[in-house]
């Protein structure tokens, strides 16, 4: 018999006594709790994750490629925002491994939302029926160095024509860049040292509002850092 164990009668008696106690009054005006602002020390994490998209125009498909160059297994969650009734796909990627999967488009369109640990976020949107998009097929991937909080943004065109891309910082950096892609990769360096490796930016295609790529998260360098400076703020 466990210490402190009560019989049913004893438990019922306790419940009845508690029911006779003064009840809490629910406030008429209620507010949602607010996240405390400011940064906190944050341990280094063993995740170095990558996710990029590749469009297969002839098959009307989108391929997502997941890679884990960190030291621990990681899980990616993918939501199809054009079919939210579908069960999200989940991928467990071992350290040093890579895998991929295919999504069919809906009337040419796709909108895939990828989530991972510690704020890792990728969003891939587009419409393959768009002439401007299908002729240029721009794609973007992120490369990082494991020792510095810097991003090497690599942009290219997989189509027959060049693409004019706009890179817009959503937080941290108050900047935007305009880059014309070619078949050979164009590289843009973003130094996020001032923000402890945290980043959030969107890449869009000029004159094509349906194409977007969003990248957010924290660059892991193997060193202890700080929590997200924008927690508690509206972005």
What role is predicted for each listed range?
Residues 1-235:
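Membrane-interface soluble catalytic domains
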